[in-house]
Amino acid sequence: MNTPTIERAIKESHNARAAIVRGDASGYLALFSEADDVTLGNPFGPFGRGRKNVEERLALAASKYRDGRNASVGFIAQYVSESLACVAEVESAEAKVAGGAEMTKVSVRVTSVFRLEAGNWKLVHRHADPLQIPQ
């Protein structure tokens, strides 16, 4: 069996981040597990628990961003076992946020947990906190 690597799933999450700051949540929707134990915490509201709730939270987050660009990721740590992986990163981009007209630098601390499901690494938890002080 040719199992996709965790590195590929992480790259897909970086692509999803670049898309969501342009208002497009489809990358995260594809990457999140279909299982009902998924969770999402982001700066725009309380934690989402369960696939349907996570979909709603992703749509809300995407609606808060426009015209995103210059997405980048700073690696902090990665822990991988046979079926689970945890990644800590700092993600940055520029975007118009919450209806604002000006481009704003947005940096968040992110913890992502992936699970190997049917040969594919799927996102099961993502938590992003805004950085108040540049790292």
Which functions belong to the PLM regions below?
Residues 90-96:
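Generic short beta-strand segments
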Residues 76, 93, 109-113:
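Hydrophobic alpha-helical segments of small multi-pass membrane proteins
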Residues 107-134:
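Short beta-strand edge/turn micro-motifs at domain boundaries
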Residues 1-31, 83, 135:
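Short, low-complexity N-terminal intrinsically disordered segments enriched in polar/charged residues
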Residues 82-84, 118:
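Residue-level signal for tight coil/turn positions that link beta-strands
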Residues 99-101:
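Outer-membrane beta-barrel domain signature
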Residues 4-7, 25-80, 90, 104-105:
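A solvent-exposed, acidic/Ser-Thr-rich amphipathic alpha-helical stretch
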